[in-house]
Amino acid sequence: MAAPILDPNAPAFTRRYMNLADPRLGAKALFASDEFFAPKERMLDPEPAVFIPGKYDDHGKWMDGWETRRKRTTGHDFCVVRLARPGVVYGVDLDTSHFTGNFPPAASIDACVSDADTPPDDAVWETLVPATTLAGNQHHYVDVSNPRAYTHLRVNLYPDGGLARLRVYGQPQRDWSRAARGELVDLAAIENGAYLVAANNEHFGPASRMLMPGRGANMGDGWETRRRREPGNDWAIVALARPGVIRRVEVDTAHFKGNFPDRCSLQAARVAGGTDASLVTQAMFWPMLLGEQPLGMDSVHTFETQLAALGPVTHVRLNIHPDGGVSRLRFWGELA
C-alpha cells in the first residue's frame, strides 16, 4: 500500500482522508470517451506520475496518465470512475504532472449515486467540482463542500488532453446498523471512516498510512518521523470511525528495522465539539489508555490486558518514544 510522499504544500484534506479513487481499495476506471494515447487506468495509479524520456509506443509518446487524442469535433472527453467506497468527498487533486503541451485547459467532476457497478444511462449526475482552469505539470487541489456520499464520479476534460493522476480525498460511509452487538470492529480503519486529525511530524511518511488496510508493502508504506535531536517524543492523533470501547490494540512496525520506535503509549478520550487545533492541545492531558510499552522491529505488537478501562472514546493519541516509524495501527473495539 505504498503511497507517495505528500507535497508539503498540499492542503490538510490530502493528509487527513483516504483516497477514494485508490484502485488498491477497489476503485476502478470504468469507461472513457477516448484513451488513444494513454489508458484511463493510469490516472488512478497510487504512485506518483513519472516521465521517461525517449519512451514511445504504437500511439506516440508514452505518458503516465490518461490521455485522449486531439479533438477535432465539438464536445469534450470524459471518464467514469467507481469509487472504492461510497463516501463524502472533501477535496480532489487534478494532477497534470509531466503534461506540458498536452494538458486540458479545464476540467470538472460530476458525481452520482448508483447501486450498479456502472451507472445506468438515466443516472442523475450532480456537479461536484465546477469547471476549473488547469495548468501544465502541476497539482490542482480543489476543496469540496458537499455533505452527500457518492459512489461514482465522471471526470470531464475540456476539450481533451492528459491528466496524470486523479486523487479523491474523502470519508467512506458504512452502514453501522449491520454491525452485530459486541462485534469487534477496527475503529482505526480508514475504510470504516477513521481519519488522522494531526501529527507533529511526517517527514518520511504521512501518519494516515497507519490507518490503511493490510500490512505495509515496504518501509515507505507507513508513518515515519525524522530523527529527533531534542527531548520529547513524536505523536499522532486519530479520530475513530465511531465512538467505541477499545478492547485490543495492534501496533505494527513491519519493515521498520533500524528505525522503529523504542516504546509507544496511548492516550484516549471521548470528545465533543472543538476544532482540530483544540484537540491537539487537549490531547496532551487525555488519560492513558496504554502505558509505555517496548516495541521491536518488523513485528505486530498486540495489547489487550494492558489497556485501561476508559469506556467509550472517540479519539486516540499514539505516542512514539522518541521517534521512528509505525506501519499500521489497529484499534479493535465494540461500538458504544
From Swiss-Prot:
<dbReference type="Pfam" id="PF03561">
    <property type="entry name" value="Allantoicase"/>
</dbReference>
<keyword id="KW-0659">Purine metabolism</keyword>
<comment type="pathway">
    <text>Nitrogen metabolism; (S)-allantoin degradation; (S)-ureidoglycolate from allantoate (aminidohydrolase route): step 1/1.</text>
</comment>
<protein>
    <recommendedName>
        <fullName>Probable allantoicase 2</fullName>
        <ecNumber>3.5.3.4</ecNumber>
    </recommendedName>
</protein>
<keyword id="KW-0378">Hydrolase</keyword>
<dbReference type="GO" id="GO:0000256">
    <property type="term" value="P:allantoin catabolic process"/>
</dbReference>
<dbReference type="GO" id="GO:0004037">
    <property type="term" value="F:allantoicase activity"/>
</dbReference>
<dbReference type="InterPro" id="IPR005164">
    <property type="entry name" value="Allantoicase"/>
</dbReference>
<dbReference type="GO" id="GO:0006144">
    <property type="term" value="P:purine nucleobase metabolic process"/>
</dbReference>
<dbReference type="InterPro" id="IPR008979">
    <property type="entry name" value="Galactose-bd-like_sf"/>
</dbReference>
<dbReference type="InterPro" id="IPR015908">
    <property type="entry name" value="Allantoicase_dom"/>
</dbReference>
<comment type="similarity">
    <text>Belongs to the allantoicase family.</text>
</comment>
